[in-house]
Structures are given as structure tokens and as C-alpha cells.
Amino acid sequence: MEEMMQFLRTRRTYRRFEQRPVDHAIAAEILEAARIASCGANRQTLKYVLVESPAMVAKMQPLVHWAAYLPPEQGCPAPDETPVLFIAVCQDESLPGANDTDAGLALGSMTAAAWAHGVGS
């Protein structure tokens, strides 16, 4: 239990990233962590899109507003500090039982798996 608590105490959220590629096998394991996350009634209403192509990542970057949470004095991440991949979590709201809680659980599992692989999220 102590190892788990230490893991949870040391995991951090990043808004500036090193420009090191993430191995596809690691990205696939992060996706698997989301896939096996708990969800209401096992409805599986979430879908995932892995974006690894540098060209597509560059197109997505301006659409992501997470850096807006930074205080103005910290500014937005520079071009050499942006993510090298994205995993989009999509909720199929046409399915019964779709809810934000399931997305939160999947995201929590993904961030834990990423951290376990030494990948900031």
C-alpha cells in the first residue's frame, strides 16, 4: 500500500513538455489503461483517438485550452514545450448511460499509466 501512496503523492500534472517521442507501445498501454477503467454498468460509452503524427499534433495544439489555466505571468507553453501526442477521449452521448464520471475515471487511469511509464500528462 505504501508504494501506491508514494506513487499518488509523486504524480504531477505538466503543462510544458520535453520534445521526446513516446513509443507507440507505451501509448497503446496508456490507452489500455483507459479501456479497462471502471465505468457505469460496464456500458463502455467512451472511444479514444490516439494522435501521434507531429503534423496532426501541431494542428490540434491551438484547439487545446488547458494552458489557459496557467497564471498570465507563466504564459502559454513555447513551441518546444507542447505535447508530442494527444489522446482524445470521446463520449458517445447517443448511448444510454453516457456520463462525465466515466471519462474522469478513464483519464485518471491514463494519467497514472503515463506516469508509471515516465510520461508526463
Question: Whereabouts are the PLM-identified features?
Answer:
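N-terminal amphipathic, basic helical "cap/leader" segment at the start of enzyme domains
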Residues: 1-86
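Small-aliphatic-rich amphipathic alpha-helix that forms the alpha element of a beta-alpha
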Residues: 30, 34, 87, 93-121
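Short helix-capping and hinge/turn segments at secondary-structure transitions, especially at repeat
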Residues: 62-65, 69, 92, 116-119
